[in-house]
A protein has these predicted regions:
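Extended alpha-helical scaffold regions
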Residues: 1-187
Length: 187
């Protein structure tokens, strides 16, 4: 009975563990299906998962999207992960030891993944020249529906764009945290 909060929480815990295992074993389709299950269960839950659990989720989704050559959502997942880490660091009152180095690495991943999204790809292109609806009919409505599902899977209201991802990275001060070489690459 998923109406019982304890049962729902046990299902969520199981699915998060299943996602971790699927990524560890490189079972990418299973990982994606599990992520969809997690999204559905989180929507049913009255309480949101804790920050570290969601951070792990976004990290795993970044890996899943990278394997699928979905550069746009790979970058978006890293953006969500960076947002969680920087918010946690701000709540801790600034730069905690060891955390700043981790945030620098993550800022680099955010900026690089956003820059790696092909220019002019918009929201339809994903990677290897395929459209986002490569696994089905290429009608615009289905493509938008699939993009909307992918966006909601990682907690976005609308599908991301390359320009939007870069803007978000800059507005979250990722450029200040990356190495001078990466700053130069951006400029």
């Amino acid at each position: 009975n998923l109406n019982d909060p304890d049962t729902l929480q046990r299902h969520l815990d199981t699915r998060f563990q299943q996602l971790s295992t699927a990524v560890e074993l490189e079972l990418w389709q299973e990982a994606f299906r599990t992520a969809e299950d997690i999204h559905t269960l989180v929507g049913m839950s009255k309480r949101a998962p804790k920050g570290p659990v969601m951070a792990s989720f976004y990290d795993k989704m970044a890996k899943v999207f990278a394997v699928g050559d979905n550069f746009l959502f790979h970058a978006a997942a890293y953006g969500k992960l960076y947002s969680l880490h920087s918010a946690r660091l701000a709540l801790q009152g600034g730069d905690a030891k060891g955390e700043d180095g981790e945030l620098e690495k993550l800022a680099s991943r955010v900026l690089l993944s956003a820059l790696a999204v092909p220019v002019g790809s918009g929201v339809v292109e994903t990677g290897r020249g395929r459209s986002a609806s490569a696994d089905g009919p290429t009608e615009e409505g289905e493509s938008k529906g699939r993009l909307g599902r992918l966006a909601s899977l990682i907690g976005l209201a609308t599908p991301p764009t390359r320009a939007g991802l870069i803007h978000d990275a800059l507005s979250r001060h990722a450029l200040k945290r990356v190495s001078p070489q990466l700053r130069e690459l951006y400029q």
